Amino acid sequence: MKKILKKEYLILKKWGQFLNCFKKFQKPCYFIVLGIIIILTSIGIFLYIQNTEIVPGDGGNFKEGILGQPRFINPVYLSNNDADRDLVELLFSGLMKYNEKGEIVNDLAENLEIKEDGKLYEIKLKENIFWHDGEKITSDDVVFTINVLQNPEYKSPQAIRWLGINIEKITDNIVQFRLKTAYSGFLESLTEKIVPKHIFEDISPKELPWYFSSREYIQKDLIGSGPFKFKKINQDNSTGYIKSITLEKNKNYFAKKPFLSEISFEFFSEENDLLKNLSRGNIDGYLISSSDGIENINEDKFNVFSLSLPRYFSVFFNQDPPEDKSDILTSKNVREALNYAVDKQQILKETISDKGKIINSPILPDFYGFNSPSEVYNFDKEKAEEILENEGFKYIDDTGIRKKSISQKSTFSFNKNLAYKDTNSDVTELQKCLADPKVGGPDVYPSGKVTGYFGNETKQAVILFQEKYKEDVLAPYGLEKGTGSVRTSTRKKLNELCFPNIEETVTLEFSLITIDKELFTNISEILKQNWKDIGVNVEIKFESISTLETDIIKPRNFEALLFGEVLSFLPDPFPFWHSSQKESPGLNLINYENKEADKLLEQARASLDNQKRQEKLEAFQEILIEDNPCIFLLRPDLIYFTSQKINGQQVEKIIEPSKRFTNVENWYIKTKRTWK
């Protein structure tokens, strides 16, 4: 015991000596201790940083600015309304979906089998997948959704995608789709969003669209299975204007759960107001479909994404215009000259600030990875002028517009000899001609009777006609008196006087119709100047999209049309160029017809082999460009601005604007550190 006490005493004594030292050398000791603490802390921090990593954390609210109002937030009545499509993309799921590379992958589907040479698709659903209200998703929901889309009483805009498709429930988690013929694009149809049967099965077709647009539906039955679910709506009670809709994370989502806690959609009626709120940081994201308005945004403050999608703008030349329209564009050489005269680089730079690509083909080789066409119409003003000169269109200095003279044969001419006692339609025309005061009149054919019979009166009139024009009719044969028979020289003079060839002056001009929106206005003005530079006069007409669709496109009532077309994930130009689609509701806008092109389009559509389909489409591309029925211009990018606080956005290609949310589950605002 004494030894222990002695030992403790010695320890206390040494500690006391240390304290005395610290008092004696207070400052030096303080800094030594502080240095040791700093070193140890730094080592700890270094080791922590070395052995941990920053990863996305849960939480954060993302605010998206939307121009316009939602109308039908449901896949059944999904239209071109961007607000509806954006919300549906986050609230609902399909059997298949697009990933960030634009590829089609499984969504609700666990497995997909394609059987019977592409005529049968069998899908097995994932286990334990649920609606936002907790009800399980089964094959019944899939069958119900497709039946609703196919039922004409519901009048769904999506119905055309499901014509001729038979769906059958095999088990609670297996369904089969049977096609009449193999169709490679059907895989894309399987991205259709599925709706819950238990919510909508008791609502009649007449009531359903009205219910979808009601506040009751949004607050009570806006049930999907997507990564986000409905939380609240902010709506003006007096006007019904929806100010915002907020979605919250679906914690029971069957796939990877989002990091963001909420996504709010803020709705604006004017783009200027939206852009102001974006610049002030009141909203975190806004999608601009063209370069319009970009100059008002400080790009340095945002993440700026140029999103590629398979849409393109072209000038379409009607190959079979209405009778009251000019047919000048049915000339392949004229179309070729117009093509060479277009400065596509100027259009790209001045209309969309180079945010897009120049295109030369209907199958967008740069987007889909196809081979480019062998022939490209690069800007060449001199070549365009040379083609028009060779076509007979001469430049008129006074007007700056090209014209050419065309000699058209008369619809009738005397081609056979006529003589006494003949009876036929040629005699009828002969009598009319002789009775014409400018040719003969009373001095030659006093009675002027038109009977179709070559009698004495007619014979005498022919004699007088021959003698009146004896220098041309009789003199070449050394005759002084008429013969009364209509032969070579007489026929020639009759044709010259009564049925001359018609000389027509054709002015190189046509009308171009397009949409009354700024981008199309700017493009059309450049086109007009490009064509004016080679002596072509163009009248530009602007129409609203509704008027354009109903009065212009549907009846094919135009000469030239500046418009856009959108392809899908699996490029299928069939609707736009196959001859079977020439009449509305087909989308062959210009009445294009080529049997070889038709065959290639049919083969490409039926092929499930990617390489073979590519070969068919590339062959079709060559034929179409050779026929030159349109001028391919550009493929604009979508410009997506997001706040720099948002991370994780990695979308490369999208099929439509709403697909910018494809990898939304990877977006994050907050971060945390975890051990490696």
Tell me the role of every PLM-derived stretch.
Residues 68-85, 108-109, 135, 157, ...:
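A structural "hinge/loop" feature
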Residues 42, 46, 313, 341-375, ...:
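Detector for C-terminal structural segments
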Residues 159-209:
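Surface-exposed binding/hinge segments that line
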Residues 240-249, 329-445, 488-529, 593, ...:
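Append "and occasionally in soluble cytosolic enzymes with long acidic Gly/Pro-rich linkers
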Residues 64, 134, 278, 284, ...:
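Periplasmic binding protein-like
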Residues 166, 231-246, 264-325, 345, ...:
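Extracellular/periplasmic solute-recognition and catalytic clefts
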Residues 65-116, 147, 223-225:
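N-terminal lobe/hinge region of extracytoplasmic solute-binding protein
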Residues 99, 193-258, 262, 272, ...:
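Gly/Pro-rich hinge or "lid" segments in bacterial periplasmic/extracellular proteins
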